[in-house]
């Protein structure tokens, strides 16, 4: 099922087969439609739509920079549907922000024109709502490299409870030490009572950018990285693979979306790819696994 053979039935694919040009991609499934967002435009945050994950259409700007706190560096958007509203967590000018809309296509607007943390540069903010309804934000702080932290949010899903800020991950494993000191792009899910955090290490510019996993039994406790990390690095013909997020597809299958370099010689424009996530029971504990196989989404008119 990880091929684009079906796409020929649904649309005429260009002979050149244009990839979807998103870095730091995120996919939202809402009302039977897949929406993809990511880093690409200097005008804000773009979106693309698909019915089958294989062929995608450009939709325009979901967030225009006029509606944001900043006017440059629009990175790593993640969109969540909560209580009838769509919340976009994204970075702008190396600060973390939230914009809200009534539709997944926008317009997303940042009513309060200020970042979530005004006095500190941060990036890669990701929402996680626990079973009891408590919202959390994982994000990257720039202290001795890029490190992943977590904090509780107020019920407005925008205000960080600063007193709860807790460190999760920093560079510790050998595979992460290619260049420079980077743990970033976190995404948290809960499975059978365990919290799983996927994250990326090394610079996104490095061919050795890759995805690892860490687990915890308490979000505010100790996060333990897998010894077998990275779970994804240079799959198939891809290099520079990372900044991932997970989602459940229409068939109920857990998927992972990530970007890779344009090719082995050029980083940009980065392109979006989609793999599968599974859990393997090892000594009574479910271990996350990421497929080496991947879908190559195609852009159609």
Give residue spans per PLM region.
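Carbohydrate-active catalytic/glycan-binding domains of CAZyme proteins
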Residues: 2-301
């Amino acid at each position: 099922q990880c091929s684009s053979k079906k796409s020929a039935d649904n649309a005429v694919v260009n002979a050149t087969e244009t990839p979807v040009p998103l870095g730091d991609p995120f996919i939202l499934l809402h009302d039977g439609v897949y929406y993809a967002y990511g880093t690409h435009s200097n005008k804000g945050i773009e979106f693309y739509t698909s019915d089958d994950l294989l062929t995608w259409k450009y939709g325009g700007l979901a967030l225009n920079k006029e509606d944001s706190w900043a006017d440059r560096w629009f990175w790593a958007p993640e969109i969540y549907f909560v209580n009838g509203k769509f919340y976009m967590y994204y970075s702008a000018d190396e600060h973390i922000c939230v914009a809200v809309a009534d539709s997944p296509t926008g317009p997303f607007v940042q009513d309060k024109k200020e970042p979530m943390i005004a006095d500190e540069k941060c990036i890669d903010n990701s929402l996680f709502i626990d079973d009891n309804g408590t919202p959390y934000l994982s994000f990257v702080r720039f202290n001795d490299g890029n490190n992943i932290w977590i904090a509780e949010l107020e019920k407005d899903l925008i205000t960080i409870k600063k007193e709860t800020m807790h460190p999760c991950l920093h560079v510790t494993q050998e595979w992460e030490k290619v260049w420079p000191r980077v743990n970033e792009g976190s995404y948290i899910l809960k499975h059978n009572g365990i919290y799983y955090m996927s994250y990326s290490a090394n610079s996104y510019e490095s061919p050795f950018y890759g995805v690892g996993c860490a687990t915890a039994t308490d979000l505010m406790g100790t996060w333990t990285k897998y010894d077998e990390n990275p779970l994804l690095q240079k799959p198939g013909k891809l290099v520079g693979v990372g900044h991932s997020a997970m989602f459940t597809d229409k068939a109920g299958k857990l998927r992972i979306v990530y970007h890779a370099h344009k090719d082995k010689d050029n980083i940009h424009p980065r392109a979006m790819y989609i793999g599968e996530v599974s859990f393997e029971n090892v000594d009574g504990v479910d271990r996350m696994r990421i497929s080496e196989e991947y879908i190559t989404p195609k852009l159609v008119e």
